[in-house]
Amino acid sequence: MQTLIIGDVHGCARELSDLLNKAHFSPSRDRLLLTGDAFSRGPDPLGVWHLINAHGAEMVLGNHDARLREQLDDISDTGSPSRTKPDQRFTLHALESIHSTLRTWLYRVPLYIEEDRFLLVHAGINPEHGLANTRFEEFITIRTWPPVKGSIDGPRWHDVYEPVHPLLIFGHDAPGGLVTKRRDGKPYLLGLDTGCVYGRALTGYLLEEERLISTASR
């Protein structure tokens, strides 16, 4: 069995399929986890949903997933979402056939997955207060430290993070790119959002092999 953890997919179903093939992933044998932000912004959110189901993927909640969930709540309550941007309208339209199913599923997606070997979150944790005292918004949006709302520049939260988990894996920070931090030769922190939806690459990590793999955006 291998455990494959993949960065933000953002509706890039072809690249997700490419990466699964590159890893020789078998749903009957292996385990797939995603850093969140699976559907929004990209060309084929429904294709991503089918791959998630076909491969039994687990996921942590991202900021785009939280927003999508709110919009699906609006549709359920009033018949239409509020405050949507063009890319969000595209995503909602592409997922129209599974709105109810997806909404239920998103409410079951956790903010983090913590196990003996790793902690998986979308954006990060509060480096001063730790996992137990990280707020909802920090789990899904934290980037800089100290936090500056909307900013993509400046020191990152993980620049001041002292490792207390064997391996902390996150996504969210496409501007920051691939992040690999080691101590005593072993990785203790990995940032896997390498901006596939922006024309760069989709990146995954094979946990047992301690090996990064990636596929170019197409």
Name the predicted role of every residue range.
Residues 2-10, 118-124, 190-192:
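Active-site-proximal beta-strand elements of phosphoester/diester hydrolases
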Residues 27-29, 56, 116, 164-165:
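A general structural motif
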Residues 8, 37, 52, 62-63, ...:
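Divalent metal-coordination and catalytic microenvironments
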Residues 45-120, 126-127, 131-156:
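Active-site neighborhood of divalent metal-dependent phosphoester bond hydrolases
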Residues 1-50, 55:
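N-terminal active-site segment of His-dependent metallophosphoesterases
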Residues 5, 34, 59-60, 119, ...:
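Residue-level marker for buried hydrophobic side chains located in beta-strands
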Residues 139-218:
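Acidic, His/Gly-rich catalytic cores of divalent-metal-dependent hydrolytic chemistry
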Residues 10-14, 40-43, 66-70, 127-128, ...:
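Active-site environment of divalent metal-dependent phosphoester hydrolases
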